[in-house]
Amino acid sequence: MVKNNKGKVCNMYQDEYKRWLAADLEDADLKPELAKIEGNDDEIKDRFAVALKFGTAGLRGVLGAGTNRMNIYVVRQATQGLANWVKTQGGSQTVAISYDSRLKSDIFAKTASRCAFMMR
């Protein structure tokens, strides 16, 4: 929860959850997951109150729907942020993207690859 400038608590994570719930999601697996947590404020808060952090080992988190979960939308956002940063460094626009045997690793690599290609 975040306090606004008048000290009132804002439940912005609920707004973000509703936005995802109403969206025409490309990853159809996430819709039933979102519907299942409807009304569960603790679960919605855990998934939507913060963004998944990009650390020294990259993105790591629980698979699922939300800004604090591993999914194609979070991968796209992180890829765009990284691509924007690389451009500011004046470096090469060549990147290497790979995947391993973890669940959905290949899908996330392809998502990142398409996103990076579009940033060229």
Model feature map: region roles:
Residues 1-11:
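Short, Lys/Arg-enriched N-terminal segments with co-localized hydrophobic residues
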Residues 12, 17-112:
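An N-terminal, well-structured beta->alpha segment
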Residues 111-120:
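Short helix-loop-beta junction
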